[in-house]
Amino acid sequence: MNLKKNNIIIGIDTSCYTTSIAAISLDKSIIFSEKIMLNVKKNSNGLRQSEGVFQHINNLGELSENLKSLYDDYNIVGVCVSKKPRPIENSYMPVFTVGYNFGKAISNSLNCKFYETTHQENHIEASLLNSNILNRDRFLSVHMSGGTTEILLVTKKNNSLEYSIEIVGGTKDISFGQLIDRTGVKLGYDFPAGKYIDKNAIECERKILNGLKTSVKDGYMNLSGLENQINKIIELEDSKYISKLVLDSVVRNLYKALTYISKLNNIDEIVFCGGVAASEYVRNNLSLKLKKENIYSYFTKPEYSTDNACGCAIIGVDKYEAESFRNK
C-alpha cells in the first residue's frame, strides 16, 4: 500500500455562496472535489448570512453522503477548514462556522488531525495548484470574488509554511464581483451573474470605441462611478455590449493598478484567484496587456478560481507533512 496515495486530507469551505468539500492525497492528487452553490432568489443581489448558514447545513449533509464512497479505499488522516474570511484579527462571518464545526465533528469522530485556515488562503493555495509560477516565496495575488477585490503582496514567512499577506491595492468601494452581479441582475440574469456576463462579452463582436471612465490611483480603484455610468446606458444598449463594457472596465482598472504595484514592489508574477478570475474575457485580455509590460499572469482552471475546498485540503497536507517531519 502506498501510504502517500491512500492517506488523504479533507478540506471544507463554507463561503457566502458555495458549500465545498475536497479530498487530497499526501502527494497532492485531487481525489474528490465537489461543491453546491447556495440558492439565491430571483432578482436578488445576495443572500443573508442566516439563510447561508441554513443552506450550508443541508448541503454538507448531501456532500458528506458522496464523501462516504472514499472510506473503503482511503484513510482520512486530517481535516482542514476555512474558519473565517481572511487571516486578520476580527475577520468573521457566520457562514464559516458551519464548515468549521462540521470539520471538527469529522475530526473528533475519526480521531484524526484538525487544522484551520481562512477562505482567502484557501483561494490562494487553490490558484497555485499546478501553477508554473517561478517564485512561490514572493508574488502578487489578486483576490476578486463576490464581495472582495484585493491586491495582495504574498510573502512566505521564514521557516514557516504560512504566508504573510499584505493588502497593497484593490477597490475602495464595491468589488468587481458586485459590479458584475448587479449589472447581470439588472439585465435579467440569475445571481451570481458572472458566467452570463462573460459569455456575452466574448460573443459581442462590437468594438468598444469609448470605454467606461476609470478611477485608479496608487493601486486603488473606485468602482461606484462605473456602476453609475452603466445604469445610465443599460436601457439604451444591448446586453452583450453592456457586458463587454463592464468586463473591459475590469481589465483596464486592473491593468492600471497592477502595473503600478508591480513596479513599486519589483514583482513580475501575479496569481489570480476568486470567481471573477474565472472569466475567460478577463483572463485573455488582461494577460495580453500585462505581458506587454513583462508582467506574467497565472490563472488556474475556473473550477479552482471559483469557491472550492482544494486549497484548504492542500494547506492541511502541508501542515500534516510538517508535523510528521518534526515528529520523526
Question: What does each of the following model-derived ranges do?
Answer:
Residues 93-98, 114-121, 142-144, 171-174, ...:
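Active-site nucleophile and cofactor-binding loops and adjacent substrate-binding regions
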Residues 15-54, 160-167, 299:
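Short glycine-rich, Thr/Ser-proximal phosphate-binding strand/loop in the N-terminal lobe
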Residues 2-7, 11-15, 22, 31-33, ...:
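A short helix-loop
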Residues 123-126, 300-328:
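Glycine-rich phosphate-binding/hydrolytic loop that grips phosphoryl groups
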Residues 199-270, 276-299, 317-326:
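A contiguous, well-structured pocket-lining segment that forms one wall/lid of small-molecule binding clefts
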Residues 36, 55-70, 253-258:
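Short, well-ordered amphipathic alpha-helical segments that serve as non-catalytic structural scaffolds
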Residues 1-6, 112, 116-140, 314-316:
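Conserved phosphate-binding catalytic cores of ATP/NTP-utilizing and phosphoryl-transfer enzymes
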Residues 65-103, 108:
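Short beta-strand-loop/turn "lid" adjacent to the catalytic site in phosphate-handling enzymes
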